[in-house]
C-alpha cells in the first residue's frame, strides 16, 4: 500500500483538541470537520491538506478520545499521517476510518514542508523524493493492514459477509 503526496510538517504533541476543536464535534460530515482541522495552530490547513501527507513528531493525536480527529484529517483530504509516535487511540481510530498511519522515528528531522513523499504502509518506510532518502518505520501488518486496505473497519466487516 503506497501513497504519494507533499508533506505538511508539524511538531510534537499535537492533541485531538488541536486536530478538531470540541466546538465542531456537533458535526458528523467529514467535509465540515475537515474545514476546521488543525484550526487552532494552522487556519490555512484545509487549503493545503488535499492530497498531502501530514508529518508530525511525537505523541500525535494525544488527548481526548475522539474519532472525529481522524475523520477531520481525512475529510480535509489528508492521504496519510506519518509521525514519530502516535497516541494509541488515535492510531486505532485512524485505521478504523481508513486513514493510513505510519510510525517513523525522527521523520521530522528528515522531511521539510512541501517535499514529496512516498509512504509504504505495508513495508514500513517513507522515501523523501526530494532527497532520495529512504526512512525506515514500523510496518502495518495483519488485521490493521486488512482494515486499511478495505477502506476502514465498516468496509472490512462488510467484506466478511
UniProtKB/Swiss-Prot annotation:
Family affiliation: Belongs to the LeuD family. LeuD type 2 subfamily.
Enzyme Commission (EC) number: 4.2.1.33
Record key words, sorted: Amino-acid biosynthesis, Branched-chain amino acid biosynthesis, Leucine biosynthesis, Lyase
Xref: HAMAP family: LeuD_type2 (MF_01032)
Enzyme class: lyase
NCBIfam families per UniProt: LEUD_arch
Keyword Lyase assigned: yes
PANTHER family in the cross-refs: 3-ISOPROPYLMALATE DEHYDRATASE SMALL SUBUNIT 1, 3-ISOPROPYLMALATE DEHYDRATASE SMALL SUBUNIT 2-RELATED-RELATED
Stated name of the protein: 3-isopropylmalate dehydratase small subunit
Subunit record text: Heterodimer of LeuC and LeuD.
Catalytic activity: (2R,3S)-3-isopropylmalate = (2S)-2-isopropylmalate
CDD domains for the chain: IPMI_Swivel
GO annotation terms (biological process): L-leucine biosynthetic process
Any one GO molecular-function label of the UniProt entry: 3-isopropylmalate dehydratase activity
Classification via Pfam families: Aconitase_C
InterPro entries recorded: Aconitase/3IPM_dehydase_swvl, AconitaseA/IPMdHydase_ssu_swvl, IPMI_Swivel, LeuD, LeuD_type2/HacB/DmdB
Role according to the record: Catalyzes the isomerization between 2-isopropylmalate and 3-isopropylmalate, via the formation of 2-isopropylmaleate.
Gene3D superfamilies named among the record's database cross-references: Aconitase, domain 4 (3.20.19.10)
Pathways involved: Amino-acid biosynthesis; L-leucine biosynthesis; L-leucine from 3-methyl-2-oxobutanoate: step 2/4
Amino acid at each position: 500500500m503506497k501513497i504519494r503526496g507533499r508533506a505538511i510538517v508539524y511538531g510534537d504533541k499535537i492533541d485531538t483538541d488541536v486536530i478538531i476543536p470540541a466546538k465542531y464535534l456537533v458535526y458528523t460530515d467529514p467535509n465540515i470537520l475537515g474545514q476546521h482541522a488543525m484550526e487552532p495552530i494552522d487556519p490555512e490547513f484545509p487549503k493545503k491538506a488535499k492530497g498531502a501527507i501530514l508529518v508530525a513528531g511525537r505523541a500525535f493525536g494525544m488527548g481526548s478520545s475522539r474519532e472525529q480527529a481522524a475523520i477531520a484529517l481525512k475529510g480535509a483530504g489528508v492521504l496519510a499521517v506519518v509521525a514519530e509516535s502516535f497516541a494509541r487511540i488515535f492510531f486505532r481510530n485512524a485505521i478504523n476510518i481508513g486513514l493510513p498511519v505510519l510510525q517513523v522515528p525522527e521523520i521530522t528531522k528528515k522531511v521539510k514542508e512541501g517535499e514529496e513523499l512516498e509512504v509504504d504502509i505495508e513495508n514500513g518506510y517513507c522515501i523523501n523524493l526530494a532527497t532520495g532518502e529512504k526512512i525506515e518505520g514500523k510496518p502495518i501488518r495483519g488485521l490493521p493492514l486488512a482494515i486499511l486496505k478495505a477502506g476502514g473497519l465498516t468496509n472490512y466487516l462488510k467484506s466478511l459477509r
